[in-house]
């Protein structure tokens, strides 16, 4: 975690929330994509994001300063989405990613959410989750494996399969 993020977390632990807007700007995409891949509804995703941030701030004392805040918030978002899903007893829709998947920048600078979601919809649930956690949330494969409770080799294989699917589909779209 960067020095700036550590300072923000320290301020939160002292009940100083003046840097919340900055914190939100640094983390909202990761939380949004962790949620939207499960609930598939923008308004619900935004509501769940509010819950995630409120819960995070209410339980800030439990968060370790050296912890990965992005992974922590993503996991909270994912869990809140799953809880919402179970409460609603809705069928989970599949979701998938983009042609920027292999870039080092991930999709943090990419603003076309609809394109991202339609590409994510090309993948199965596990592939999509690996892509979102690794590419959008910038987590290391080892962290993704821990979150998904899968062996590292499986996570790497799922990522490679997802990349191949996305390359094929994106290529087909460009040829049209």
Tell me the role of every PLM-derived stretch.
Residues 13-14, 51-68, 87-89:
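Sigma70-family region 2
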Residues 33, 47-54, 67-79, 157:
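Structural recognition of an alpha-helix C-terminal capping motif at a helix-to-coil junction
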Residues 1-30, 147-148, 168, 172-176:
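N-terminal module of bacterial RNA polymerase sigma factors
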Residues 61-65, 75-95:
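Arg/Lys-rich amphipathic alpha helix in sigma70-family domain 2
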Residues 130-134:
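A short pre-motif secondary-structure segment
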Residues 82, 146-176:
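DNA-recognition helix of helix-turn-helix
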Residues 24-42, 59, 120, 169-172:
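Amphipathic, Lys/Arg- and hydrophobic-enriched alpha-helical face
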Residues 2, 83, 90-118:
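Internal acidic/polar
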